[in-house]
């Protein structure tokens, strides 16, 4: 098993082994395409050591004929494509939920459990088409070799997505990230990339793909990464309880100024990111310094594209004293973020897409 990856100094490490870390706000704000050394890391078990020459992908289940592919065969048999996509952990911004009510046993992820990269690989749909999908396939399951001790019982990581998403042209079996061979830390030699879905569905180190007529039975599909009611007792929940998480909920975050900053009163630049998830796009971001009494519409960077975040910035007047700056995003379906963390609190701390806020002191 490999050790923690080489990362930029200043990463916020929530756990060393297995490695779980996120970049600070300032580092995340520097690049629309996140450098590999800044990209967040989320693991449930030790990272496996895989020789790319020995790696094999087995595709089977409800197919006309199974496939076994080496990396070279995957790269040469199927046309490579590049997709820019944001990955976001379902626990992104969990710290905001924890501030409202404690969530024992979970990492206090801040604003940085999300990053964007250029991914290059084969379309999953092309590989599935080469196998010939059966008529009754509803889900495509992925399995990896990294054993997760937290699973009950301990088992390798896995999950699944609906076949309609799996056969969408944006879903990849990726072997490159930002123009370089995919590192072990980010799932190399090959990982699944499912744009618009929570990061857990973009299974790293994928070694088996199964076409089936039901969602994956893996712990991380049936036990973890499920949205439970606020009053659920996690000690009594059973596999399949709650809602399996898939598409990312509309979200935004303030990256500058940082929480706790001291700054001059008056015009202040506020900047951050917004992400709509699935194939939706961000169309508007508003910023307030008076609790939502008045709003300033932010300027959105670049053109809206599915599967990627949009950076935004606004200039607002910050009065003297202790001031809470908040933001809210709107997407192409006219959905808007919920206001309060209390509204979305849940016992696993997933999907905190309430209004982000930072508190500054102006003088």
Where are these regions (language model features)?
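Structured, non-membrane catalytic/scaffold regions adjacent to prosthetic-group chemistry
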Residues: 2-363
């Amino acid at each position: 098993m490999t050790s923690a990856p080489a990362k930029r100094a200043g990463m916020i490490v929530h756990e060393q082994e297995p490695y779980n870390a996120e970049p600070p706000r300032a580092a995340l704000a520097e690049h629309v395409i996140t450098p590999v050394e800044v990209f967040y890391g989320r693991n449930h078990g030790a990272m496996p050591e895989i020789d790319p020459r020995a790696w094999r992908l087995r595709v089977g289940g409800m197919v006309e004929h199974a496939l076994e592919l080496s990396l070279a065969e995957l790269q040469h048999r199927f046309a490579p494509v590049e997709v820019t996509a944001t990955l976001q952990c379902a626990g992104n911004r969990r710290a905001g939920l924890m501030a409202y009510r404690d969530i024992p046993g979970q990492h206090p992820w801040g604003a940085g459990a999300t990053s964007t990269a250029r991914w290059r690989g084969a379309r999953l749909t092309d590989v599935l088409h080469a196998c010939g999908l059966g008529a009754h396939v509803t889900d495509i399951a992925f399995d990896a070799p990294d054993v997760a001790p937290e699973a009950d019982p301990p088992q390798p990581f896995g999950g699944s997505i609906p076949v309609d998403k799996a056969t969408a042209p944006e879903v990849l079996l990726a072997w490159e990230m930002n123009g370089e061979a995919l590192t072990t830390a980010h799932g190399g030699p090959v990982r699944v990339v499912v744009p618009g879905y929570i990061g857990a569905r973009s299974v790293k180190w994928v070694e088996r793909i199964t076409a089936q007529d039901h969602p994956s039975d893996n712990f991380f599909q049936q036990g973890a990464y499920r949205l439970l009611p606020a009053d659920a007792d996690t000690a009594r929940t059973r596999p399949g309880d709650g809602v399996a998480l898939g598409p990312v909920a509309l979200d935004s975050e303030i990256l500058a100024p940082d929480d706790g900053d001291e700054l001059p009163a008056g015009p202040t630049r506020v900047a951050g990111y917004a992400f709509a998830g699935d194939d939706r796009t961000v169309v508007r971001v508003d910023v307030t310094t008076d609790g939502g009494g008045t709003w300033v519409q932010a300027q959105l960077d670049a053109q809206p594209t599915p599967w990627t975040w949009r950076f935004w910035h606004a200039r607002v007047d910050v009065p003297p004293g202790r001031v809470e700056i908040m933001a809210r995003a709107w997407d192409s379906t006219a959905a808007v973020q919920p206001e309060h963390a209390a509204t979305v609190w849940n016992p696993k701390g997933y999907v905190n897409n309430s209004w982000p806020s930072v508190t500054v002191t102006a003088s």
